[in-house]
UniProtKB/Swiss-Prot annotation:
Superkingdom of origin organism: Eukaryota
GO biological process assignments: gluconeogenesis; mitochondrial respiratory chain complex II assembly; succinate metabolic process
InterPro entries the UniProt entry points to: SDHAF3/Sdh7 (IPR008381)
Species lineage: Eukaryota, Fungi, Dikarya, Ascomycota, Pezizomycotina
Subunit composition and interactions: Interacts with the iron-sulfur protein subunit within the SDH catalytic dimer.
UniProt keyword Cell cycle, yes or no: no
GO CC terms of this entry: mitochondrial intermembrane space; mitochondrial matrix
Family: Belongs to the complex I LYR family. SDHAF3 subfamily.
Organism: Gibberella zeae (strain ATCC MYA-4620 / CBS 123657 / FGSC 9075 / NRRL 31084 / PH-1)
Transit peptide, from-to: 1-8
Name this protein carries in UniProt: Succinate dehydrogenase assembly factor 3, mitochondrial
Signal peptide limits: none
Annotated compartments: Mitochondrion matrix
Key words, A-Z: Chaperone, Gluconeogenesis, Mitochondrion, Transit peptide
Known function: Plays an essential role in the assembly of succinate dehydrogenase (SDH), an enzyme complex (also referred to as respiratory complex II) that is a component of both the tricarboxylic acid (TCA) cycle and the mitochondrial electron transport chain, and which couples the oxidation of succinate to fumarate with the reduction of ubiquinone (coenzyme Q) to ubiquinol. Promotes maturation of the iron-sulfur protein subunit of the SDH catalytic dimer, protecting it from the deleterious effects of oxidants. May act together with SDHAF1.
Length: 130
């Protein structure tokens, strides 16, 4: 076998198959800024205000998290959210039942409060237009 073919053959066997390379995890402050920029660029003003408030509250609440597993999970989910917003893949997207089943009661309560806030803003917006 020629040396170049030998190198090509060995290079493919050392890769991890068809799994995509994991995305690099952004540190908290650059991720926070990216999220706010994504909201400013891709969301309508009323949704942007609600989203910005939610992001600020969540990052404030997780400021003193010591558990690395919780921190990595938190940053990973927010980074995936940023990618969805930037790619306009979020419109009409439903919540994954598997993620919902893994949520704690407190997280489900937060989600319910967020849903109510969105619905109340929709009602207020409808009354103002009349």
């Amino acid at each position: 076998m020629r040396p170049s073919l030998l190198r090509l053959a060995s290079a493919t066997s050392t890769q991890r198959g068809l799994k995509p390379n994991p995305m690099a995890l952004l540190p908290p402050i650059p991720l926070y800024r990216r999220l706010l920029r994504a909201h400013r660029k891709h969301l309508p003003p009323d949704m942007r205000i609600l989203g910005d408030e939610y992001i600020k509250a969540e990052f404030r609440a997780h400021r003193k998290v010591d558990n690395p597993a919780h921190l990595i999970g938190f940053l990973t989910e927010w980074q995936m959210y940023a990618q969805k917003i930037e790619g306009d893949q979020w419109v009409g997207d439903k919540l994954d039942e598997q993620k919902l089943s893994k949520m704690s009661d407190e997280q489900i309560q937060q989600l319910y409060e967020l849903m109510q806030a969105i619905q109340n803003r929709g009602k207020e917006g409808g009354e103002q237009e009349s």
